[in-house]
Amino acid sequence: MDADIELVLAAVDSSDEAVDAAEYAIAIAERYDADLHLLHILDQRVMRGVEAGDVSAETVADQQRAVTGRVRERLPETVALSHSGAVGFSPNRLGQTPGSVVLDAAEELEADFLVVPRVSASGTRDEVLGKAALHVLEYASQPVLSV
Protein backbone atom coordinates (compact mmCIF):
# COMPACT_ATOMS: atom_id res chain seq x y z
CA MET A 1 0.00 0.00 0.00
CA ASP A 2 1.39 3.41 -0.99
CA ALA A 3 1.54 6.30 1.41
CA ASP A 4 -0.90 9.12 0.78
CA ILE A 5 1.51 11.93 -0.10
CA GLU A 6 0.03 14.92 -1.90
CA LEU A 7 2.53 17.65 -0.96
CA VAL A 8 6.25 17.39 -0.28
CA LEU A 9 7.86 20.36 1.47
CA ALA A 10 11.59 20.93 0.95
CA ALA A 11 13.33 23.48 3.16
CA VAL A 12 16.09 25.25 1.24
CA ASP A 13 18.65 27.99 1.61
CA SER A 14 21.20 29.05 -0.99
CA SER A 15 23.51 26.07 -0.43
CA ASP A 16 24.26 23.25 -2.85
CA GLU A 17 23.24 20.81 -0.11
CA ALA A 18 19.78 22.35 -0.03
CA VAL A 19 19.46 21.89 -3.79
CA ASP A 20 20.62 18.28 -3.38
CA ALA A 21 17.94 17.78 -0.70
CA ALA A 22 15.39 19.31 -3.06
CA GLU A 23 16.38 16.69 -5.65
CA TYR A 24 15.36 13.99 -3.16
CA ALA A 25 12.11 15.88 -2.62
CA ILE A 26 11.55 15.91 -6.38
CA ALA A 27 12.04 12.14 -6.52
CA ILE A 28 9.57 11.62 -3.69
CA ALA A 29 7.02 13.95 -5.27
CA GLU A 30 7.40 12.19 -8.61
CA ARG A 31 7.11 8.73 -7.02
CA TYR A 32 3.89 9.61 -5.20
CA ASP A 33 2.43 11.91 -7.86
CA ALA A 34 2.62 14.79 -5.37
CA ASP A 35 3.28 18.52 -5.60
CA LEU A 36 6.48 20.14 -4.32
CA HIS A 37 6.77 23.26 -2.19
CA LEU A 38 10.15 24.95 -1.64
CA LEU A 39 10.38 26.83 1.64
CA HIS A 40 13.25 29.32 1.43
CA ILE A 41 14.64 29.88 4.93
CA LEU A 42 16.50 33.15 5.49
CA ASP A 43 19.15 33.42 8.17
CA GLN A 44 18.67 36.20 10.72
CA ARG A 45 22.16 37.48 9.85
CA VAL A 46 21.06 37.94 6.24
CA MET A 47 17.94 39.81 7.32
CA ARG A 48 19.96 42.06 9.62
CA GLY A 49 22.32 42.74 6.73
CA VAL A 50 19.41 43.70 4.49
CA GLU A 51 17.94 45.95 7.18
CA ALA A 52 21.33 47.61 7.78
CA GLY A 53 21.93 48.07 4.07
CA ASP A 54 24.99 45.80 4.09
CA VAL A 55 23.26 43.14 2.00
CA SER A 56 21.13 43.92 -1.02
CA ALA A 57 17.58 42.60 -0.84
CA GLU A 58 17.82 42.06 -4.59
CA THR A 59 20.89 39.86 -4.09
CA VAL A 60 19.01 37.74 -1.56
CA ALA A 61 16.04 37.49 -3.91
CA ASP A 62 18.38 36.55 -6.78
CA GLN A 63 19.85 33.74 -4.67
CA GLN A 64 16.37 32.42 -3.91
CA ARG A 65 15.39 32.63 -7.57
CA ALA A 66 18.59 30.80 -8.52
CA VAL A 67 17.80 27.93 -6.13
CA THR A 68 14.22 27.77 -7.42
CA GLY A 69 15.55 27.80 -10.99
CA ARG A 70 17.98 24.96 -10.28
CA VAL A 71 15.16 22.91 -8.81
CA ARG A 72 12.79 23.78 -11.66
CA GLU A 73 15.41 22.54 -14.19
CA ARG A 74 15.28 19.10 -12.57
CA LEU A 75 11.53 19.02 -12.10
CA PRO A 76 9.48 16.64 -14.24
CA GLU A 77 6.40 18.13 -15.86
CA THR A 78 4.19 15.95 -13.68
CA VAL A 79 5.26 17.72 -10.46
CA ALA A 80 3.75 21.13 -9.68
CA LEU A 81 6.10 23.56 -7.91
CA SER A 82 5.24 26.32 -5.45
CA HIS A 83 7.52 28.27 -3.13
CA SER A 84 7.56 30.70 -0.23
CA GLY A 85 10.07 32.28 2.12
CA ALA A 86 10.44 32.70 5.86
CA VAL A 87 12.95 34.12 8.31
CA GLY A 88 14.49 31.44 10.49
CA PHE A 89 14.67 33.53 13.66
CA SER A 90 12.69 36.40 15.12
CA PRO A 91 13.77 38.84 17.83
CA ASN A 92 10.08 39.27 18.66
CA ARG A 93 9.20 35.56 18.92
CA LEU A 94 11.66 33.65 21.07
CA GLY A 95 10.22 30.31 19.99
CA GLN A 96 10.77 31.01 16.30
CA THR A 97 13.67 28.92 15.08
CA PRO A 98 14.45 27.51 11.64
CA GLY A 99 13.04 24.16 12.73
CA SER A 100 9.84 25.64 14.09
CA VAL A 101 9.44 27.70 10.91
CA VAL A 102 9.65 24.53 8.82
CA LEU A 103 7.13 22.75 11.05
CA ASP A 104 4.75 25.72 11.07
CA ALA A 105 4.91 25.98 7.27
CA ALA A 106 4.35 22.23 6.96
CA GLU A 107 1.25 22.49 9.13
CA GLU A 108 -0.07 25.55 7.31
CA LEU A 109 0.48 23.98 3.88
CA GLU A 110 -0.72 20.57 5.07
CA ALA A 111 2.48 18.97 3.79
CA ASP A 112 2.59 15.20 3.91
CA PHE A 113 6.35 14.70 3.69
CA LEU A 114 9.30 16.93 4.67
CA VAL A 115 12.82 17.04 3.28
CA VAL A 116 15.55 19.04 5.05
CA PRO A 117 19.30 19.27 4.46
CA ARG A 118 21.56 18.52 7.41
CA VAL A 119 24.68 20.42 6.45
CA SER A 120 25.14 23.67 4.61
CA ALA A 121 27.52 24.49 1.76
CA SER A 122 30.21 25.52 4.24
CA GLY A 123 30.11 22.01 5.70
CA THR A 124 29.38 23.29 9.19
CA ARG A 125 26.37 22.56 11.31
CA ASP A 126 26.34 26.24 12.29
CA GLU A 127 24.15 27.16 9.34
CA VAL A 128 20.42 27.73 9.55
CA LEU A 129 19.10 24.54 7.98
CA GLY A 130 21.74 22.31 9.51
CA LYS A 131 20.38 23.27 12.91
CA ALA A 132 16.79 22.90 11.77
CA ALA A 133 17.09 19.27 10.71
CA LEU A 134 17.31 17.80 14.21
CA HIS A 135 14.36 19.85 15.45
CA VAL A 136 12.27 18.84 12.45
CA LEU A 137 13.22 15.17 12.87
CA GLU A 138 12.24 15.26 16.54
CA TYR A 139 8.96 17.12 16.31
CA ALA A 140 7.43 16.60 12.86
CA SER A 141 4.19 14.68 12.63
CA GLN A 142 4.95 13.87 8.98
CA PRO A 143 7.64 11.57 7.64
CA VAL A 144 10.97 13.42 7.30
CA LEU A 145 13.98 12.77 5.11
CA SER A 146 17.13 14.56 6.26
CA VAL A 147 19.92 14.46 3.70
Task: Annotate each PLM feature.
Residues 113-135:
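Glycine-rich, Arg-bearing micro-motifs that act as flexible, cationic patches
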Residues 32, 132, 139-141:
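Short, structured coil segments at secondary-structure junctions
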Residues 3-52:
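Small/aliphatic-rich secondary-structure junction motif
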Residues 143-147:
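Short hydrophobic/aromatic patches at helix-to-coil boundaries
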Residues 34-35, 111, 142:
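Short glycine/serine/threonine/alanine-rich loop segments
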Residues 2-3, 45-114, 125:
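Charged, low-complexity cytosolic intrinsically disordered regulatory segments
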